């Protein structure tokens, strides 16, 4: 499950390292990561009775965590890759449907109409790569980057995902705070390298608290910034391989 403003193409290296696994990467440009569980499951295209291993990066971590906590019988293994924290609840006036959200959406539509994303979108993508990855190696072709990040409605899509992630974080926070009857084996990968080093202490503490609540394990990645799937795809693949055999991985 990708994170905010990410694409399925970015996870190609992880998929390549798992040739014996049935890996499904949901496309956030078609199905918002903050969608309900039924929508996400349909987007993954897995059989209704299939038992899953779920992997989520950034806000995708919140999405798979909600899935695992609300439907524990469907999930056999959970991997959170530098997941957003349940404390990242944003500002309520900007939650979906609230006045702030409506104002930002109107602005994003206007910028799309006058061509701002079309001109600046690919540059924003390059900035994301520079700040979020130590390797800085972008797996997207220029054409794909232009199509996705230079799309008229791309900034509206990014905002909708961000605002939706705040609401999702608030929901998952309540789930984590409540007594947890059942949770699948959970692994957390935490990036503290590159630009992530500036907030590493607090970030790692938050991730450890989340791991404690889930009875999960934490692996710290000092050689990776936030975009772990670009810097350390091998670490993600190795953690996934510890999952129960013959699982669908979404």
Regions found by a protein language model. Name each.
Residues 8-10, 33-34, 88-89, 229:
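Short N-terminal helix/helix-N-cap motif within the alpha/beta-hydrolase-1
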Residues 78-116:
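Flexible "cap/lid" loop of the alpha/beta hydrolase fold
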């Amino acid at each position: 499950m990708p994170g905010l403003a990410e694409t399925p193409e970015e996870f190609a290296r992880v998929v390549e390292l798992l040739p014996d696994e049935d890996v499904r990467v949901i496309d956030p440009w078609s199905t918002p990561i903050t969608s309900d569980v039924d929508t996400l499951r349909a987007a993954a295209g897995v059989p209704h009775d299939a038992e899953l291993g779920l992997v989520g990066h950034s806000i995708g971590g919140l999405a798979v965590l909600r899935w695992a906590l609300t439907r524990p019988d469907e999930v056999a293994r959970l991997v959170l890759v530098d997941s957003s924290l349940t404390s990242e609840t944003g500002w309520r006036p900007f939650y979906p449907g609230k006045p702030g959200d409506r104002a930002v959406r109107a602005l994003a539509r206007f910028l799309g109409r006058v061509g701002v994303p079309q001109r600046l979108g690919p540059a924003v993508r390059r900035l994301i790569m520079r700040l979020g990855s130590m390797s800085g190696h972008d797996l997207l072709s220029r054409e794909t980057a232009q199509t996705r990040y230079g799309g008229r409605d791309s900034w509206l899509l990014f905002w909708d995902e961000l605002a939706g992630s705040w609401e999702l974080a608030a929901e998952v926070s309540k789930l984590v705070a409540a007594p947890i009857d059942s949770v699948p084996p959970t692994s957390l990968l935490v990036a503290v390298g590159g630009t992530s080093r500036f907030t590493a202490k607090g970030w790692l503490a938050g991730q450890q608290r989340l791991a404690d609540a889930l009875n999960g394990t934490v692996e710290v990645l000092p050689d990776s910034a936030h975009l772990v799937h670009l810097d350390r795809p091998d670490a993600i693949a190795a953690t996934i391989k510890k999952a129960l055999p013959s699982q669908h991985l979404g």
